Regions:
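Short, Lys/Arg-enriched, Trp-marked, Pro/Gly-tolerant hinge/linker segments that flank
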Residues: 1-7, 24-27
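Phosphate-/nucleic-acid-contacting segments
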Residues: 18-84
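N-terminal positioning helix adjacent to the helix-turn-helix/winged-helix DNA-binding module
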Residues: 3, 7-10, 14, 32
């Protein structure tokens, strides 16, 4: 079955996956925001807006390519994921 995700879900899943791969809630993005947006077939401004919303909601903090996950549970709720 094909699962369709919203932009917010895609970005949340991506951030959680990057955290898992880096074994840390504080990590650097390896691709540009443009490259990440293209991989989701969305516009760069949609990705940036989503990251700003996540930051405003207290889920993450960004500093350039650095991402810090502040509220993993909230981010997982957006991603519709559960801890494994």
């Amino acid at each position: 079955m094909l699962t369709l995700h919203t932009v917010r879900e895609k970005v949340a899943i991506f951030l959680l996956e990057q955290s898992r791969l880096n074994k840390s809630d504080d990590f650097m993005l390896q691709k540009s925001r443009q490259e990440i947006a293209e991989s989701f077939a969305i516009q760069k401004f949609s990705l940036q807006r989503c990251l700003k919303e996540f930051a405003a909601d207290g889920m993450i903090r960004t500093n350039g390519k650095q991402i810090i996950i502040l509220d993993r549970e909230k981010l997982m709720a957006v991603a519709k994921m559960t801890e494994k």
